Amino acid sequence: MKAIVLTGYGDVDRLEMREVPEPRAAAGELKVRVSASSVNAVDWKIRRGDMKAWMPVEFPHILGRDTSGEVVEVGLQGTGFKVGDRVLGLVRQAYAEYVTAPLDAWALLPPKLDLKDAAALPVVALTGAQLIEEAVRPRRNDLLLVTGALGSVARSAVHAATKLGARVIAGVRKGQVPEAAKLGVESVVALDDPAMVDRIPLLDSIADTVGGETVARLLPRVRRGGTIGSVLGEPSGAKERGLVVRAIQTHADSKRLAALAQAVVAGELVIPIGGRFPLPNAREAHRLAERGGTGKVLLTA
């Protein structure tokens, strides 16, 4: 089969289309013909070598955690799925024509969800939901600020927090305030406006998707004993202020992924698409994703 292979750390020219062995579904796995995968920040950070100190890879290496497609093989002991099912999943080595992964990595695709666009969901939707439900753990009426609120992970976090009855403040940049107001949150604050930050009421918690100085400036706005949930590790100075810090690593969750897909169909959760590229054009896709923005970049079959 064809796959996009990372041949070493570096720029996008280290991504090459190659013939690689086609996988077979082991016991308890599905094999899926990939309709689309997506480019996440972790992909281009791995490619550049930003993460090699704690997430080294062996070359050649196939990137990609998101995928959607059609089941072509069900391994032994594989229940709940059949050949021909349309699925989306949190996998590994998704920049390829076929991919295999355990059953709990997959969810059936709702009929009204576009098969290719579904590849935008698994990593960001699960990360946002797990950030709220497993790290922040807000109670009803807690006042929670989500940083980087127009990002895909943060959009999912806003959705999850709202479902739990939290009062959500969307934290964005000045120029993003009008767009963030459409998220259905209690209020919006420009985190690059010191005057607005100073007016933030006392928070019960922060769901941080940005890190760095942005979250550091917000720590004084959180009540003692409040919670910082993060996808980027522990913010400096948080525990010294008497705050509870919980970081998460995204993990497969079939039931939660299925529910998030239904939320997209219902219009409750919107993950924008920022670009679509054929799989052979992975270099261009990485360039666009690396420039940033608020939309997911897809690689399509």
Located regions from the model:
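N-terminal glycine-rich beta->alpha transition that marks the start or flank
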Residues: 11-14, 20-68
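A glycine-/small-residue-rich N-terminal strand-loop-strand element
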Residues: 68-91
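Mid-domain Rossmann-like dinucleotide-binding core that forms the NAD(H)/NADP(H) cofactor-binding site
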Residues: 121-190
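Glycine-rich cofactor phosphate-binding loops and adjacent beta1-alpha1 units
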Residues: 169, 178-246
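C-terminal hydrophobic helical "lid"/dimerization subdomain
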Residues: 257-301
